[in-house]
């Protein structure tokens, strides 16, 4: 996985988790939903990079 892509994926995942927690604690469903979406985006980016790495190894 490219280091910059991995860092971006980890950053998106972390920001999403924080938004979910803050949104849940504050009762802000919009922020909680945005956090879930951002975390999912980070998960997808990480999965994409792992797939690219797996293809390169073959």
Curated annotation (Swiss-Prot):
This is UPF0337 protein SAV_738. Pfam families: CsbD. Residues 1-58 are annotated as: Disordered. Belongs to the UPF0337 (CsbD) family. InterPro entries: CsbD (IPR008462), YjbJ_sf (IPR036629). Residues 31-58 have a biased composition (Basic and acidic residues).
